[in-house]
Amino acid sequence: MELPSINSTTSISDNQELRNYYDKLLFKNNSGKSLADLPGKMADFNDNSAAAHPRSRVDFINGYIGFREDKQSLLGQKNTKRASFSAFADEGRKQSEMSINGKSPNLSLFSFEFNGTPTQDRKPYKQDYLNVMNTSPNNILSPLNNSSQKYYPQKQQQQQQQQQQQQQQSIFDPGRRSSYISDALIHGNAATQQPQYSQPVYINNNPSLQVPYTAPSEYTQQQQYSSPFNARRNTQPVLNLHPAAAPTNDAGLAVVDGKNLTSSKELHDLYLDCGSNYFASDKVYKFIDSIKGTLRGDNVSASSSRIIEFLDFLKNCNLNYNPQSDAFISTAVSNASSTGAAKSKNSTSMHLHYKPLVLVSLKNGKLELLSKPQTATLILKRGDLVIIDGDRGKDLVLVVEPVVDINLALFINFLKKKIHFDSLITNSQQHFPNDQFIKTLVDTTNGKPVAHELNPKLYDIIELTQLIIPSKQVLRFATPWESSTNLHNKFQDELKALHIAQLKLRSLNNNNSGGGLNIKILNAEFQFDRKKLTFYYICQERNDFRDLIKELFKFYKTRIWLCAIPNNLSIDSKFYDSNKFEWEMYQDMMSHYSMDNTGIVVAPELNRLKLDDFQIGVYMELVKVLFG
């Protein structure tokens, strides 16, 4: 056979001879039979076999077919009517209506037989709906459309096995099952049996109601889902319709103006209950309020006038904090001014370089001036317990004055420096008389002649009069646990340390033939982080503490610091010898320990403490002897 001539523009479908050549010659099997008309031959074979052996058969698209179905209904109609997708999409809603009303509603779904005739007595086959939706019979997303299947890799094999079983069971149309089997019962049970690891579907294409497919859900293992499937894959952000409540602050702090922190009422009450006795708050508040009233000119007395005059002197010595002070006015004009109280109110109208400090109290009422960070968001109140910078560590203190003005800062700074220099003098005969100290200091600074000069080796005039901004800062509020439990444990350790130090001192003095140490240990104080242990003592002569420090370091393995109390104020006789509250408290603890079999030594509660307030007593006595 000669093939017709073709070129690049020739189409096989347009050339009849070329098409016949491919149909009759090329499409043949090994036996030489043509393969071009296989569909037609198969139809003829089925017609002959059906006529010879009429029996039921299975169609994998339309379900079970009986022998009464004619062949024309199967193959004669090429445009077979099928149920629409929207009809199957409403199946869940129709079934819910029927379950609620107790009867079937007006059906809008029709099943079509092979001849295209709709019938209402046959329910739409659920497997058709699942095939269209590409899901399993129990609402499990198949691996083809489930983008989140990677989150449940352990259950994929189980889901595939369930799908295969459902497909095998779905070969027979449930609409033609035996009458004694309830289709509603079968399908209802299959629909309600959700697997434990099923993936949720969306409702009405609303992406904000449930978790999207691309995010794993922790609660999908416990919830059941029977809502219609959303064919649209959701990748939009999830809108939380029920946001969680704002977490409560376990530290008991309250937010002010959205950025500042302050102690709540409950936390502040806890501060007052735990810190009042330990930090001698009553005596400290009384002393500071008295000084503030004197500096304002509220008190009219000789001592108050001397305090105000000395305050003006301190201002003149700190021009960097007070550029518009009276130092810019001539001495004659300054002396011709009004009374001291009025001059104190009007002399400092502006302090350009001064930033308010914070006045705090340590154990037994020892005062400290601190600075606040420039970016601090803490709103402090009197009585708050805060964590501050300590000596190479952290410490816990009581807030006395949240905002200290320049007048109070200058006066408190002078008192602290005076106490420091006095504590370094071991021989009481070397102290300069306190009743003459202020006048001598002022005259020496102004260049006037004095009867007795201050010893520059014992007193540094510049350091006495100059206010230096402290480097230690307020860090944060103390937590409830730090204010109660940790502070109580700290006090209990301090009682034991006081007892051990006195035992060590007694042992060293007994073994020393030269007389030993002539000191009296008044108190012990741990830094809050236990990195430093300070012992406060008083003595009348110079002593060598190296052996005592070695013994204490062997026991505590921390830095040991011995701090002297000025011996020219009779602090031990006025605030310690007649009371010794802490020493008696420790003796009482040990007596209960000897009678108790539990082996636990517990100090009294913080709100029941009564301590030796000798630290604030030092400030009170110093003001009295200097300006009284």
UniProtKB/Swiss-Prot annotation:
Region (Disordered) location: 133-174
Compositional bias (Low complexity): 136-169
Principal cellular location given in the protein's record: cytoplasm
Places the protein is found: Cytoplasm
Positions of modified residues (Phosphoserine): 31, 34, 84
Transmembrane feature ranges: none
Keywords: Acetylation, Cytoplasm, Phosphoprotein
Modified-residue entries (N-acetylmethionine), positions: 1
Signal peptide location: none
An example Gene Ontology molecular-function term: mRNA binding
Modified residues (Phosphothreonine): 235
InterPro entries: PSP1-like, PSP1_C
Keyword flag Phosphoprotein: yes
Pfam families: PSP1
PSP1 C-terminal domain sequence ranges: 472-565
Keyword hit for ATP-binding: no
CC per GO annotation: cytoplasm
UniProt family annotation: Belongs to the PSP1 family.
Other comment: Present with 1550 molecules/cell in log phase SD medium.
Protein name per the record: Uncharacterized protein YLR177W
